[in-house]
Amino acid sequence: MAVVATHQFAQCITCHVWSPDQTMVAFCPNNNEVHIYKLIQDKWERAHVLQKHDQLISAIDWSSRTNKIVTASHDRNSYVWNQEGAEWLPTLVILRLNRAALCVKWSSAENKFAVGSGAKTVCVCYYEKDNDWWVSKLIRKKHSSSVTSVAWHPDNILLATTSTDGKCRIFSTFIKGVDTRDSGTSIPDSKFGEQIVQLDLSSTWAFGVKWSPSGNTLAYTGQSSMVYFVDDIGPSPVAQSVAFRDLPLRDVLFISERMVVAVGYDCNPMVFTADERGIWSFVRFLDERKLAPSGSKYGSQFTEAFGKFYGQSKQMGSDTVDPTRARGGAHENCITCILPLRSEGVTVVKRFSTSGLDGRIVVWELDSD
């Protein structure tokens, strides 16, 4: 059974992210601002509004170690926000883009971040202490269309990208003076911007790339209602394509090495798992309106703490797909973002959040059995 709780923060949410202690959530309400809400006595109250961009903010990320927020916008700019006292102060990042910035992610070590753009370019940004500013090195002439998503490998060197040219690519982002060769990367002698592999699995736009916790598996989605899983990244990767008959997906999240939750235009998170042979398949929707068969392994429930400040609406679950079922439930419009909510010292994701074009943020918790 799936129990879902939601909060209506805005009419539409472009993207969202959590503070390191998960007591604050930042999101873009489909404009040029970032709204930060803080949990105070079981109620969400708006604490800050970040105003610096001139156009729509397309992506945001909040570093867990350094407590810095990075934003990317259609105005072709990116800012790093530092909290000083009660204020968040922006620092402009020199991106050198002539098209919109579409996605942004901090690296695993949080000493770099990557910005994908409509200029067919990826900007890998790092801080120059001597000059007290953020600069970028550009990966050019590799993508033939807009870069829709970026994902950092746990080694802090490899970067995966997806593009509207239908391809997923993996690059080295080694920067001398910022990275070290003993980072544990499987490509120890790679240079900045070197393309490690290009995956041509999708014939349509590609979105939502993510690495598994170990970095051994990569997953991304295609506009043709397909999910792609890739193992053994290198000259001879092992790839699988999983087709489904529902609407396309926009983002994916590894719950564990063998479980993925994906979200998109169907307004309902979808669970994919791998069997003992490593074969991936669709399992179920998380927010179904039908009773799940007895013995269903995966379910969803909302924690009591979050339930106090989110309005709860219970929905039933099912492991079978009914083409006549009502779509949605917790979400009523496209889900564009899914993020993990990790507990300290726990590698397997038990809780995660989703946000969408309906202006809602939903927090889910998977059953432990």
Q: Over which residues does each language-model region extend?
A:
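Terminal intrinsically disordered, low-complexity extensions flanking WD-repeat/beta-propeller proteins
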Residues: 176-200, 204, 240-241, 245-369
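N-terminal alpha-helical scaffolding segments that mark the starts
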Residues: 1-20, 24-28
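Canonical WD40 repeat/beta-propeller blade segments in eukaryotic WD-repeat proteins
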Residues: 10-18, 55-62, 98-106, 144-152, ...
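Structural hallmark of WD40 beta-propellers
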Residues: 22-26, 66-70, 79-80, 90, ...
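Per-blade loop-tip surfaces of WD-repeat and WD-like beta-propellers in eukaryotic adaptors/scaffolds
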Residues: 1-4, 31-48, 77-101, 109-112, ...
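Conserved strand-to-loop turn within each blade of WD40 beta-propeller repeats
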Residues: 28-31, 72-75, 115-119, 162-165, ...
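Internal alpha-helical scaffold/solenoid segments in large eukaryotic proteins
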Residues: 51-54, 132-157, 201-252, 361-365
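Blade-loop segments of beta-propeller domains
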Residues: 45-62, 66
